[in-house]
């Protein structure tokens, strides 16, 4: 008997060694390592190696990985031209899709199972270039390629803003990249897997993921959560706003609730701490943080009995805003981080358990209808 699972809830489409989630206890692990340990003691580059190769790197392996990233920031001029030909008012994820598709069209010699992991590292570096230049295009600035450095986060921030980032900014960006790296198989990862299952190339699979990420119920949630803080504007208005919008009008509190977690999202706790390291030098970010804190208290009081708590998108926008990024870039920053997770999943699927993903639909329409000519209708 066929069973319809709306939203594919509780449907397992692959086995994985990548990410473990315990939604009841609020546990998230990459390859067996707690997210808290990776954030507190590791780096994004170490996470790249871990996700692709299955273990933490030695010093030599880490240095080799950093060298590879530094070599791969360059993208063909035609790709940058494609982004800059678009109007700066264009949607950031739309621009990123354009750039990613352009790379797919140029890389004509791609073949699966030929240096897949090395190819993934190259793509991760190039995505940093694309995301930085999506921001620069929308701000009306000239193209800029990330400069080689000892930190992926530093190279990305320097390319984006054309200024030397502070230690706190580099640290926050690095940790944000780790936090958004992977989360099993949400909509965007599923979209990437469907594309990769046809043996489409990696770039095209990422384009499919970006299309899914764009939606406000997935990657766009950080933008929507932050827009709430902007709308409230003043910490003293939080209570009235909450009563009006959430309690009376029954609007969804963005940044709250998760399909998997029935407790506080462990990533949200870390993003909240990261925000505290950045807001002291940014009055607006500090004000939005105060609003978020008060909104969190009201939200937990209202919804915790239903297992609804802050998710990763609730505080991440404040971190990105404090780093200097406007709201329109939040989803693109999510994509920069999640590129690693997408690639790790599609490589794992194609190399170890490849099968064309082809689900069925349960037909509930009429059994048979006799065709009636247009003159007799």
Swiss-Prot record:
Gene Ontology MF term list: citrate (Si)-synthase activity
Pathway as given in its UniProt record: Carbohydrate metabolism; tricarboxylic acid cycle; isocitrate from oxaloacetate: step 1/2
Gene3D superfamilies in the record: Citrate Synthase, domain 1, Cytochrome P450-Terp, domain 2
Record text on activity regulation: Allosterically inhibited by NADH.
Additional notes on this entry: Citrate synthase is found in nearly all cells capable of oxidative metabolism.
Catalytic activity as recorded in UniProt: oxaloacetate + acetyl-CoA + H2O = citrate + CoA + H(+)
Similarity field: Belongs to the citrate synthase family.
PTM per Swiss-Prot/TrEMBL: The N-terminus is blocked by acetylation.
Swiss-Prot/TrEMBL keywords: Acetylation, Allosteric enzyme, Transferase, Tricarboxylic acid cycle
InterPro entries assigned to the protein according to its UniProt record, in alphabetical order: 2-MeCitrate/Citrate_synth_II, Cit_synThplmales, Citrate_synth-like_lrg_a-sub, Citrate_synth-like_sm_a-sub, Citrate_synthase, Citrate_synthase_AS, Citrate_synthase_bac-typ, Citrate_synthase_sf
Name of the protein this chain belongs to: Citrate synthase
An annotated GO BP: carbohydrate metabolic process
Gene of this entry: gltA
Any Pfam family: Citrate_synt
Entry GO terms, CC: cytoplasm
Keyword Hydrolase applies: no
Top-level EC class: transferase
Subunit: Homodimer.
Statement: the UniProt record of this protein carries the keyword Cell cycle: no
Catalytic site: 258, 313
């Amino acid at each position: 008997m066929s069973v319809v699972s709306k939203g594919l809830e509780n449907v397992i489409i692959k086995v994985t060694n990548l990410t473990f989630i315990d939604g009841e206890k609020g546990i998230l692990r990459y390859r067996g390592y707690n997210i808290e340990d990776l954030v507190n003691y590791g780096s994004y580059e170490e996470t790249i190696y871990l996700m692709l190769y299955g273990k933490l790197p030695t010093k030599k392996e880490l240095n080799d990985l950093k060298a590879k990233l530094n070599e791969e920031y360059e993208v063909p001029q035609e790709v940058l031209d494609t982004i800059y030909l678009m109007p700066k008012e264009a949607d950031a994820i739309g621009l990123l899709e354009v750039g990613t598709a352009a790379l797919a069209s140029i890389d004509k010699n791609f073949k699966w199972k030929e240096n897949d992991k090395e190819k993934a590292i190259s793509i991760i570096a190039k995505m940093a270039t694309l995301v930085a230049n999506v921001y620069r295009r929308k701000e009306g600035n000239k193209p800029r390629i990330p400069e080689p450095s000892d930190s992926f986060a530093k190279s990305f921030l320097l390319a984006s803003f054309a200024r030397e980032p502070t230690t706190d900014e580099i640290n926050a960006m690095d940790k944000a990249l780790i936090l958004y790296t992977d989360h099993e198989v949400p909509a965007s990862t599923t979209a990437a897997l469907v594309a990769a299952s046809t043996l489409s190339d990696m770039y095209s699979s990422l384009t499919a993921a970006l299309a899914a990420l764009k939606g406000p119920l997935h990657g766009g949630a950080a933008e929507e959560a932050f827009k709430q803080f902007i709308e409230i504007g003043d910490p003293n208005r939080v209570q009235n706003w909450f009563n009006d919008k959430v309690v009376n009008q029954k609007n969804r509190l963005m940044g709250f609730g998760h399909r998997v977690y029935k407790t506080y999202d462990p990533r949200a706790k870390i993003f909240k701490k990261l925000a505290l390291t950045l807001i002291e030098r940014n009055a607006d970010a500090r004000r939005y943080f105060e609003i978020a804190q008060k909104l969190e208290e009201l939200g937990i009081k209202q919804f915790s009995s239903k297992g609804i708590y802050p998710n990763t998108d609730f505080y991440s926008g404040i971190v990105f805003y404090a780093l200097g990024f406007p709201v329109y870039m939040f989803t693109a920053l999510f994509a920069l981080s999640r590129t690693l997770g997408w690639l790790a999943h599609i490589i794992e699927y194609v190399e170890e358990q490849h099968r064309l993903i082809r689900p069925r639909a349960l037909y509930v329409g009429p059994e048979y209808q006799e065709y009636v000519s247009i003159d007799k209708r």
